[in-house]
Regions:
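C-terminal effector/interaction modules appended to NTPase cores
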Residues: 4-130
């Protein structure tokens, strides 16, 4: 069986591009700072780097990456302060404000809440110029 080097190079380039896009999210500054509060519905702790869905608008769930301050994980009933970096903040501009409580979800199941204490990305700030 002969393998086309051109086809293999194209596949490799596509995979590298996908990895680059995923790593760009990890290398961006966080979008918001929050207080995480988990409600006990998870069986296991949420580890730093956890990527659940967040209900940022009444009709919009988006994935975000959690980073926790001073702890590696938060127990199922625990709280901690940290940040969320959203995957596509340009899709839901001007929808957040300090004090807003957004649900943290695994599918339709709410596993906790994040109360916004700071907004770093002006595009997301409801009162910002974005």
């Amino acid at each position: 069986m002969e393998i086309s080097l051109g086809h293999l190079t194209k596949q490799l380039a596509e995979r590298l591009n996908l990895c680059h896009k995923e790593n760009n999210v990890m290398n961006r500054f966080p979008d918001i700072e929050v207080i995480f509060e988990f409600n006990g519905t998870r069986k296991n702790p949420a580890n730093d780097g956890y990527r659940p869905a967040h209900l940022v608008m009444d009709d919009y769930l988006t994935t975000g990456i959690h980073h926790y301050y001073g702890v590696e994980s938060i127990p199922p009933n625990g709280t901690a302060k940290g940040t969320i970096t959203f995957l596509s903040p340009e899709s839901y501009p001007h929808c957040l404000w300090i004090g807003k409580k957004i649900s943290i979800q695994e599918g339709a199941r709410i596993v906790g809440y994040a109360t916004i204490t700071n907004i770093y990305n002006p595009l997301l700030n409801k009162t910002g110029d974005g």
